[in-house]
Amino acid sequence: MEKMYHVGFDDTHGAKYVILPGDPGRVEKIAQFLDEPHFYCQHREYTTWLGKVDGETVMVMSTGMGGPSTAIGVEECYKTGVRTFIRIGTTGGIN
């Protein structure tokens, strides 16, 4: 498989789970709660780290701001084998 155009990685990561903060600055902080955290990839607004939870590979990837960049990140992660998406962070549009 070729690398995904926007997120910058292919399917060799082995993760089926991804935690999705919006801010790239939060990715490393979140990854430190995983076992064996390590930097994986950075392309555009998508900063990605990998780690383990109970022996399973878990990805932490920023999505940038807004729905369109989140949709692109989710779609490209799905194409690489990720099947569970956990969004964490704030919601700016609620009154």
Regions found by a protein language model. Name each.
Residues 1-95:
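Metabolite-binding pocket within alpha/beta catalytic cores that recognizes anionic/polar moieties
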